[in-house]
């Protein structure tokens, strides 16, 4: 279920009709995950994963469990960091852009610099995925849905727990947790470390977490919860190689002197802190009040831009994979308050919410080495123009969001209910930089959803909905000519927020302990924000960010999960996705085969498939429990071919991967032991984990597979571990 506000026209219609009494009608909070509630009355496609499911898979990153949900695609980064996409939206973007999905952790709408998700995998209580435009609940960037992660809490962690794991390529994990509970309170604290040397050269990482939660029961109807998560993360290269030939001969991305094959960014040092405080109060009138305050800090340092030229502007072949141009220091603070009042009655339910955010983003980029100023048309070089420690950029953006939202749900006739949501966001951007530039912008955006659910039987329902999502322009898009380091892009302060429109109809049922959910969907994106020269396209003239893009994402999703019998569990997730550009008039590539000139050829990409969207995805997981305490799991993950580029020139073949997990639990007295072993890519299949291209990388005048940036999968991987609970 979900939450939002009252669509006045729907309210007037609903209140004028006689509603049948089907028991209390309820709405679901966006601040907490009501994972125990039935999905039968939902008007949108929703999937949930429990802590037991996440823990039973013994995953190294969130991708390994999210692929069991239809419509989810992820891009795995180094370590346990991933970027999540839903229904192919924003799969064409691969830098640090927002993902088009709202990520909410314990009520905190989290955004990290890279658009990725960093969360302690051992502190997850549940994951809820809402598909379709979800800005009616979560505001900015919920173009295709939301992923809601709730961390562990409650009296069930009133024990001690420790685990150790080892695996391929130096993987090690250590964790210790202790908790306590009585009638008045419960708490736990947990410390963990995940580290590995990595398959690829320089792909080592080390993630340390300290987190905990304290819940105090004020009385029988109210409680207060404080949660904290602190992490230090060090990670290096993603293992990128340049071109198909190097992918075949050098999959480990060992630096062999090809300066163009280096990762654009390296040596990340990330410090994260999440704090939240939630007050919850139940009232006798079937109402609940939630107030959630939070602070989220992200301080990220890294190096960027592989160096190819010395201070005179001359190409230097002696430069290595340690030579980079810029030092980057990015710091953000997200602060906010969310409050919701939910009320449930025999025939209708309401929710009213307030979402206030005060976010600050600071970015500082300095030169690591002296560099020349190089201009084209006519070509000229000024040696030592930029000196070590000079600013490349230094800026601060304050983002303030003032939003109200709500939901109204009404029984219309026997077994038929309708839901209406609406949200209003006022967004204020205020930008300042070291050049004394100051820009401000304001956006007012409405988002909404209307849906219906018909309960055929107690275990079967048909649902349909229409919803919207939006994304507001960023300062770097609005004022690119002034704040961007690239002089070819000019300002466009008239940019408007982009909108996605989601249409969905579905059928869900539970038969003999097996859950079925079938959904047909379409997402239309008109006039979305893109550069006039295309996504990462070259340009030989001025360009700008503009509302000029169009795309359509439509398909079918099927989810089947449950118990075939008490010893055999099944999960099937199938997605058919047809995602293509409906408007993409100009994509530029420099194909003149001369590194000192910039002659661009422009192409029309309208009608082409969205890069990195497979038409077919199928994930199947079978759990078999032949003996008490023993569980054997087999997993198959299939993806059909996709294109790595906007022009649909470079086709990446289909692949099928098999994984296996075995675990055994043994209990004696107050002690519970568990041992497990996991093998990923069981048959050691070679394939590209990521593949992308937007230009003639090797400058040979031909756009082909040698222009790809590729991360080759690490192949067969083993992991094993032992845990004890007491």
Task: Describe the function of each predicted region.
Residues 62, 84-85, 101-104, 117, ...:
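N-terminal periplasmic accessory domains that precede
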Residues 240, 245, 360-362, 367, ...:
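Surface-exposed extracellular loop regions of Gram-negative outer-membrane beta-barrel proteins
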Residues 251-282, 393-399, 470-525, 535-563, ...:
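Outer-membrane beta-barrel signature, preferentially recognizing the C-terminal barrel domain
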Residues 411-418, 522-524, 544-645, 723-725:
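Gram-negative outer-membrane beta-barrel transporters
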